[in-house]
């Protein structure tokens, strides 16, 4: 039995020695021409290759002793070749430049590190060097395997939205897709557009409504409830800096409809003001409300249906498309057809000189209740763009770089009413109802509520109104 085990062990050792010799001899035996191309390393075998000129070991590096991993691509033969010390045995599977490079007296260069693609990664995706991606309002460039991003303050700040929504501030914020990708400065530049009030406008005497002081003012009032069909909803100025034109045209249209008791209910054209009133006819680059009211008095506007908004406000052919003449009695009549050929009525609507309403909360309420909506000049802060619902009050940015994040600019809106709510603690909260000009997808169907009686964001500082310029034939 013991002799049998010895025979088996001896046979096993003999087989192992034979296989090792066969393995070592593979680099010394040419298996034939059919293996000289298009072969990879077999298990335990390295086939011979055809010899070509080129730099292989010089690029890859040389390896001491036998190293089957010391291999590089032999492009001319579509194969692999070796640069290890085993090549001293005159094997033809070695790279052509092994002898000329690896046998030199100087030290061998280190082996090339395994190739890894250059570039950057973001969200599981690889980007090549020089690639540029957009992250909200900032551009990020892949440079030196790192992302280098601009540091603009974005109009949509997720951190600020979260801060507002987690706090008990009385209103909620939302991320609006139309604002995503814009910087805060771009929001101020394109979504507002009203210039700060001129000294002439601020020096106007305040006028109080003739409504008696004893008249009860309701806790809740909306102009459209008192004058249904005579007031007009919000439009969308898009990226045209013309809140000065939108608010002026809308207030004038409401006032003319109310004064004529529904005889003239057309919404007036802000595009008429944008294209014809502003200097150099570039009204999307901001304008003043006093200039807009001057134009309404001296030149007048056609309806929004007659002169609709241009799709491309930057087009070179957006010059003034309306002309009119005076009849000598203060009324003007259009001398050109409507830019919208479908609309036939090119009637010109005019207003009296504007007047300033008292900044007193009660006086503003009386004016709206007696004569209709008014124009308010307010200050827009960075958080206002994200308003969704509730009673707005400015919430200071939590960002440490306060000077960079806390900014404001002038905006013009239309006040249409007011109301009162009970707060979470049971306290009474008063608010104004205002129409913005950022479309109906923003805020509360295009409207917003804002604290009343405390001049929140200067909403009560400058209130403007006007009468429609109607003749005896126009009035009911």
Swiss-Prot record:
Protein localization: Secreted, Extracellular space, Extracellular matrix, Basement membrane
Residues with attached carbohydrate: 38, 175, 314, 360, 455
Residues in the signal sequence: none
Annotated Gene Ontology cellular component terms: basement membrane; extracellular space; lysosome
Record's protein name: Tubulointerstitial nephritis antigen
Domain SMB: 59-107
Highest taxon in the source lineage: Eukaryota
SMART domains per the UniProt record, alphabetical: Pept_C1, SO
General function of this protein: Mediates adhesion of proximal tubule epithelial cells via integrins alpha3-beta1 and alphaV-beta3. This is a non catalytic peptidase C1 family protein.
Alphabetical GO biological process terms: cell adhesion; proteolysis
CDD domains attached to this UniProt entry: Peptidase_C1A_CathepsinB
Any one Gene Ontology molecular-function term assigned to this protein's record: cysteine-type peptidase activity
Gene: TINAG
SUPFAM superfamilies noted in UniProt: Cysteine proteinases, FnI-like domain
Keyword terms of this UniProt record: Basement membrane, Cell adhesion, Disulfide bond, Extracellular matrix, Glycoprotein, Secreted
Main location: secreted
Annotated family: Belongs to the peptidase C1 family.
Pfam families (alphabetical): Peptidase_C1
Disulfide partners: 63-83, 87-94
Source taxonomy: Eukaryota, Metazoa, Chordata, Craniata, Vertebrata
Residues the record marks as site: Cleavage: 49-50
Keyword flag Acetylation: no
